[in-house]
Amino acid sequence: MKLVFVHGAGGSSLSFYYQLRHFRNSKAIDLPGHPTGKPCVSIEGYLEWVRGFTTARRYKDVVLCGHSMGGAIAQLYALRYPDELRGIILIGTGARLRVNDDYLNRCASPGEDNAVWMDGQRDYYQGVESDIYQVLMRRSTEVGPAVDLNDLQACDKFDVMDEIQNIGLPTQVMCGSEDIMTPVKYTEYLGSKIKDARVQVIAGGSHYVQLEQYQKVNEQIE
């Protein structure tokens, strides 16, 4: 089995820092534009890029684990190319990812020296341990608000609510109980529509539950 992690909007492979340390031979992808290269403008575009990445490396028995936007990519992969995956793991995501205008506006008008946008990034990572917090913030500044906006706009257009029941791969769905961006009802919906999906709500976790409650998340992945 090859465990491949895909990060969320404006993120990077560092979103799975603790998972990479725990799961031997796993891989976390940096999507284009995060921070190098040009970002894709749609979830479909990111899907094809990820597919190209995994097939070029001849990964076999891939279990694709996606967080937030990465979860959207994983869902679409499972719907479009199910024979290429062994299973999917969805963390803090949904079958539809409508984005609150506050998040979009903060990216579009990030303030002088991106100060307004950076305040939002700090809020995202407030539950993360200090050993990784500063590293995450540095990477955020490298990715920047323009790429974050691009990704959130792609998420805002994502909607597979009419298709999600067609996923036939082994699926695990989890989220933090305090997640505001992708609330528990999103995870419950996925669990109700995907046949035999395993569902877990991690008590006390928020949107970056895999960083905040990494031991519990790793136990669930195992």
What positions do the PLM features span?
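Catalytic histidine-centered segment of alpha/beta-hydrolase-like enzymes
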Residues: G205-N218
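Conserved acidic catalytic loop of the alpha/beta-hydrolase fold
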Residues: G45-V62
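Short beta-strand/loop motif that positions the catalytic acidic residue
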Residues: I167, V173-C175, D179
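Flexible "cap/lid" loop of the alpha/beta hydrolase fold
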Residues: Q75, L79-R80, L85-A115
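Conserved alpha/beta-hydrolase catalytic His-Asp/Glu region
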Residues: R98-D101, D113-N166
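Acidic catalytic loop of the alpha/beta-hydrolase fold
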Residues: E178-T182, H207
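Conserved HGGG/HGGXW glycine-rich cap/lid loop of the alpha/beta-hydrolase fold
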Residues: M1-G37
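Gly/Ala-rich beta-loop-alpha elbow adjacent to hydrolase catalytic centers
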Residues: G66-G70, A74
